[in-house]
Structure formats: structure tokens, C-alpha cells
Design a protein with these regions (language model features):
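Extracytoplasmic
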Residues: 1-147
């Protein structure tokens, strides 16, 4: 199941599994892992320039002010942070926020990371665009916007 389904647009506020992306670019792919008796899908092997798309969020008149992502960075040196750009409607669309993911010590050692976002209204696709050095950057488990 992806976000490009027949059920209508998504609300930006509930937590969404990252593995529900409707499009992935580059080396990134969906993996699953058994956590607390339930298989969770997440995006793995993300590299510089890869992106994940989610269609469509209905922001309506919701006053979102932030964004939180559960992610992991298997690097051990703090100079190897990954950067995630939150863009609307395309990989080079309007930038609404930027999130840094420093090393967490393991590729599934999930931590929550947050950033402020610019106000958004209406219906939009969300593109998570990833940047960094040295091949594999991070894994992403889930995310949501904050009102």
C-alpha cells in the first residue's frame, strides 16, 4: 500500500510509515523489520540526491508549524550527518523545512528529529530529498507534521 491510493488525500498530522512512499529515487528501497511483534516497513540505503515522494497531503487550513521524523544514521562520527529537505510537489519544489540526522550508532537505531516548517495550505505532494556524503546516509521509519 502506498500513499497513491483510492482513499483520498492524507492528513499531515497522524504518523505515517515512511515505507508507504509512492515513489523512490536512486538507491533507496523499502525494507521490513519485526518490531514488537509487528513488521514495520522503512526506507533504507538512502544516498545523496535520493528522494521519497508522498501523494497527496491535504493541509487544508491546518496550521502546521513543525515536522518530526523517526530516522537512523549508522555512522559513528558526527561529521557524517544526513540532511533532509522537505519540498512540495517535486524534488526541486518549494522548500518548507530542513532536518538534520546526526549519527545514531546503527541503521535501525531510531531517534526522533524535528524541525520547524513554513506554513502550508492546500493539497500537495511531499518530497523528502536527502543529502550528505559517503554513500549510505540514513534510514527513515516514520514521520508526521506538528500543528
Amino acid at each position: 500500500m502506498t500513499t497513491q491510493g483510492t482513499q483520498g488525500p492524507l492528513s499531515p498530522l497522524p504518523v505515517l510509515e515512511a515505507g508507504r512512499a509512492c515513489l523512490l529515487s536512486g538507491a533507496a528501497y523499502i525494507e521490513s523489520r519485526l518490531e514488537q511483534g509487528v513488521y514495520q516497513e522503512y526506507i533504507s540505503h538512502i544516498q545523496d540526491g535520493n528522494w521519497a515522494a508522498y501523494k497527496y497531503f491535504d493541509f487544508g487550513q491546518a496550521a502546521v508549524s513543525g515536522f518530526t521524523m523517526a530516522a537512523a544514521n549508522g555512522r559513528f562520527d558526527s561529521v557524517y550527518s544526513a540532511r533532509v529537505e522537505l519540498r512540495l510537489d517535486s524534488p526541486d519544489g518549494t522548500l518548507i523545512g530542513t532536518l538534520d540526522i546526526p549519527p545514531t550508532g546503527g541503521w535501525t537505531d531510531w531517534r526522533d528529529f524535528s524541525c520547524p516548517v513554513q506554513p502550508v495550505q492546500g493539497r500537495h505532494a511531499l518530497y523528502l530529498v536527502f543529502h550528505g556524503d559517503l554513500g549510505r546516509l540514513c534510514s527513515v521509519k516514520e514521520f508526521h507534521f506538528i500543528a
